[in-house]
Amino acid sequence: MTPPGDPIDAVIGGHSGLPFTQTLGSRLWHKPGAIGMPANDGTPRGWYSILAAEDGGIDIALHALDYDHAAAAGALRAVNPDLPYAETFETGLWPNMDVMPESERRERGRPTAPGSVLWPEERIAAAE
């Protein structure tokens, strides 16, 4: 745990729903999405990231995970037919966006693209 007052270099969230990578000055904010929940982008894919040390920095690669979403939806309906997330596995759209900011609501149904970002060495050094 970082002591109060010490700078934070990077924040990496987990099971975060909406995948993205953002640099804020020398700092990094990364959310890999979730393997068990589509990204509200109209595709049934889950998401994960691989972080790897590279010459010049840290490579952060965002990957889509295709899986048997129809079987997952069927299994969910078998145990809880009233839970709306079975449809989410099929459509890639969340049943509720009440807690989402308007900017993220507008992105609903727009497919997320896999990609890679290099967090450069000089930004890492500046954050130390």
Question: What is the role of each PLM region?
Answer:
Residues 9-15, 30-33:
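Active-site neighborhood of phospho(di)ester-bond hydrolases with catalytic His/Asp-centered motifs
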Residues 1-10:
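Conserved catalytic scaffold of divalent metal-dependent phosphoesterases
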Residues 23-128:
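Acidic, His/Gly-rich catalytic cores of divalent-metal-dependent hydrolytic chemistry
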